[in-house]
Amino acid sequence: MAETFPAYLVEKTEDGQALNRVQLSDSDLMDGNVTVAVEWSTLNYKDGLALTGASPVVRKFPLVPGIDFAGTVESSDDPRYRAGDKVVLNGWGVGEGHSGGYAGKARVNGDWLVPLPEGLSTRQAMAVGTAGYTAMLCVMALQDHGIKPED
């Protein structure tokens, strides 16, 4: 019998969509060349919309929501990643058109992954999460335009 793992799955219904807690197996994972054992994910505004169906965030059904995650590579056909590597993902349509971080595992394209920065745990990376990453990009853009805190 195939090993299973827990997941939240958004499924299409006559009335819109439903969120269910299910057990999946590797054969249920979407296409990709890296399989990651998900350790942490976050709950972002977009995730809330996807979970409730309040906005059409999910574009493919059934789908595991979760626009980001951090975890450990389980298997890889991408030469940049090996089993045991710690990685982070955010963006790339994950949680919208490709299954995301609200499952025990995710299979994604290696181009979408970033090695976990040294000195950070997967938990710490997701404590910052997509919202923190977005905020930092905004700060960097301000700095690139010469704006300083004292301005």
Specify the residue positions occupied by each region the protein language model found:
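Cytochrome P450 core scaffold surrounding the K-helix E-X-X-R motif
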Residues: 46-52
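Short glycine/threonine/proline-enriched tight-turn/helix- or strand-capping micro-motif at secondary-structure
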Residues: 15-25, 54
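Glycine-rich beta-strand-centered segment in the early N-terminal region that forms part
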Residues: 27-43, 54-94, 100, 112
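NAD(P)H dinucleotide-binding glycine-rich loop of Rossmann-like/cofactor-binding domains
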Residues: 90-151
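Short polar catalytic/cofactor-binding loops
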Residues: 11-15, 41-43
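Eukaryotic N-terminal low-complexity, Ser/Thr- and Lys/Arg-rich leader segments
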Residues: 1-6
